[in-house]
Amino acid sequence: MAGRTVTRADLCEAVYQQVGLSRTESAQLVEMVLKEIADCLARGETVKLSSFGSFVVREKGERVGRNPKTGEEVPIEPRRVMVFKPSSILKHRINGTVGDGLDED
């Protein structure tokens, strides 16, 4: 069921083919966009791409975990995690269904 994996090189090639920039300029554009998204997330900002979805950074508090081998309780440090929430349009597109055209994110 798994399809092929799309890489940075694939994205650069798609920009090259569809936008008409040189391969070097296409690669630079893709890198700039990905860097900006990563920088925003590192600052704790939400990145919302209309009709695609949102990348959200969430804070997870400290909690107690358990070592599965020994059963010993171990504290799990607080951390930040990134979550992707797809838009309803993307969900409908993936599932091949017709949506109402309204983006809920």
Curated annotation (Swiss-Prot):
Q: How is this protein annotated for GO cellular component? A: cytosol
* Keywords from the UniProt entry: DNA recombination, DNA-binding, Transcription, Transcription regulation, Translation regulation
Q: What are the recorded GO MF terms, alphabetically?
A: DNA binding; structural constituent of chromatin
Judging by the UniProt lineage, the source's domain of life is Bacteria
Sorted alphabetically, the Gene Ontology BP terms of this entry are: DNA recombination; positive regulation of metabolic process; regulation of DNA-templated transcription; regulation of translation
Q: Does the keyword Manganese apply?
A: no
Say which family it is in.
Belongs to the bacterial histone-like protein family.
Q: What does this protein do?
A: This protein is one of the two subunits of integration host factor, a specific DNA-binding protein that functions in genetic recombination as well as in transcriptional and translational control.
How does the annotation summarize its subunit structure? Heterodimer of an alpha and a beta chain.
Q: What is this protein called?
A: Integration host factor subunit alpha
Q: Per the UniProt entry, what species is this protein from, by scientific name? A: Xanthobacter autotrophicus (strain ATCC BAA-1158 / Py2)
